[in-house]
Amino acid sequence: KRCYRTPDLKSQTCPPGEDLCYTKKWCADWCTSRGKVIELGCVATCPTVKPYEEITCCSTDNCNPHPKMPKP
């Protein structure tokens, strides 16, 4: 499995057993000026969403590009 990972936004091979890619977004102190913090990576199971987070999981290679990345 290959997923985009932060902080370098490069597609990387996931560790064994981590077969899902995820995108997690949340607001930090600077949310109004810079927008939401975005974290990308690999997980074994989709994380539980906390009230202030948005989490999307997907199961195909590189299915979690950063929202501002150009589409291939």
From Swiss-Prot:
Q: Which Gene3D superfamilies match?
A: CD59
The protein's matches in CDD domains, at most eight in alphabetical order, are given as: TFP_snake_toxin
**Keyword field:** Acetylcholine receptor inhibiting toxin, Disulfide bond, Ion channel impairing toxin, Neurotoxin, Postsynaptic neurotoxin, Secreted, Toxin
The record ties this protein, via SUPFAM superfamilies, to: Snake toxin-like
InterPro entries registered for this protein in UniProt: Snake_3FTx, Snake_toxin-like_sf, Snake_toxin_con_site, Toxin_cobra-type
**Tissue expr:** Expressed by the venom gland.
From which residue to which does any coiled coil extend? none
In the record, what terms sit under GO molecular function?
A: acetylcholine receptor inhibitor activity; ion channel regulator activity; toxin activity
Disulfide bond positions: 3-21, 14-42, 27-31, 46-57, 58-63
User: Which cellular component, as a GO term, is one annotated location?
Assistant: extracellular region
The record's section on PROSITE patterns has:
SNAKE_TOXIN (PS00272)
Superkingdom is Eukaryota
* Location in or out of the cell: Secreted
The role this protein plays is: Binds with high affinity to muscular (alpha-1-beta-1-gamma-delta/CHRNA1-CHRNB1-CHRNG-CHRND) and neuronal (alpha-7/CHRNA7) nicotinic acetylcholine receptor (nAChR) and inhibits acetylcholine from binding to the receptor, thereby impairing neuromuscular and neuronal transmission. Ranges of nAChR inhibition are in nanomolar (competitive binding with alpha-bungarotoxin gives Ki=8.66 nM on muscle nAChR and Ki=9.47 nM on alpha-7).
Q: What is this protein called?
A: Long neurotoxin Tx-NM2
Lineage of origin? Eukaryota, Metazoa, Chordata, Craniata, Vertebrata
